[in-house]
């Protein structure tokens, strides 16, 4: 994968996160801001989730209240380099824990 392909895939991932949050109709108030390739999700309880891209390694990183994760693009999905878990599944779990309301990223 070259840098251009990486950025296109990372942009697509972040757009999917934005679209899901924009369409979320639950009671939890989740705000997000994207600045310089870094997306920050802010929750009512003051906790945050940070998603950023690491261009030199062609990875997407996820920082949650529960820990940090690094994802590589494999077979059409972003996969955690330690656990093998899918990015969207880990993000949904973290958002659910930090917002107190079930959130799905399909």
Swiss-Prot record:
NCBIfam families: FeS_CyaY. Coiled coil: none annotated. CDD domains: Frataxin. Involved in iron-sulfur (Fe-S) cluster assembly. May act as a regulator of Fe-S biogenesis. One of its GO terms (molecular function) is ferrous iron binding. Keywords: Iron, Metal-binding. GO terms for cellular component: cytosol. The keyword Iron applies. It holds the Pfam family Frataxin_Cyay. PROSITE patterns: FRATAXIN_1, FRATAXIN_2. Belongs to the frataxin family. The lineage of its organism: Bacteria, Pseudomonadati, Pseudomonadota, Gammaproteobacteria, Enterobacterales. The keyword Iron applies. One of its GO terms (biological process) is iron-sulfur cluster assembly. This is Iron-sulfur cluster assembly protein CyaY.
């Amino acid at each position: 994968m070259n840098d251009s392909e990486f950025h296109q895939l990372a942009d697509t991932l972040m757009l999917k996160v934005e679209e899901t949050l924009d369409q979320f109709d639950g009671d939890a108030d989740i705000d997000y801001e994207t600045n310089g390739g870094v997306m920050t999700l802010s929750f009512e309880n003051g906790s945050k989730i940070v998603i950023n891209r690491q261009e030199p390694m062609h990875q997407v990183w996820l920082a949650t209240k529960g820990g940090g994760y690094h994802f590589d693009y494999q077979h059409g999905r972003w996969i955690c380099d330690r656990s093998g878990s899918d990015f969207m599944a880990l993000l949904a779990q973290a958002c659910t824990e930090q917002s107190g309301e079930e959130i799905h990223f399909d």
